[in-house]
Amino acid sequence: MKEMDCVEVIVEKKIYAKDGVHKGMQGWICDPEFVRGTWLVNFPQCGENEDIATISVKEEDLKQIDVMYAAVNERIKAQFEKAEQASGDLSAYQV
C-alpha cells in the first residue's frame, strides 16, 4: 500500500469505533509514512459534510480497493447511530 491508495476497513475494533470508524468504511491513505505497521487513513463523507475521522489503522486491518465511495461511510455511520439511539449499547452490533 502507499499514499493515496483507497482502502476499506475489514474488521470491527473498539479502537477504531471510538473515532466513528467501523468495518466496511472506506478511506484513503493520506500520509506516505508507514509507521509501526499502520497507515494514516482519512474517512470522508459526501460533499461538504465533515470527515468522519483521520486515524492510524493497522495495515492488516485494511484491504486495498479500486474506488472509494464516501456514501458507504455515511450509510454505515447512520446504521451505528440508529442502533446507538435504540439501545445505547453497540457491543453486539455488527455490520
Name every feature range the model reports, one short phrase each.
Residues 2-64, 68-69, 95:
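Basic/aromatic-rich interaction segments and small domains that mediate binding to polyanionic partners
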Residues 67-95:
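Long, low-complexity intrinsically disordered regions
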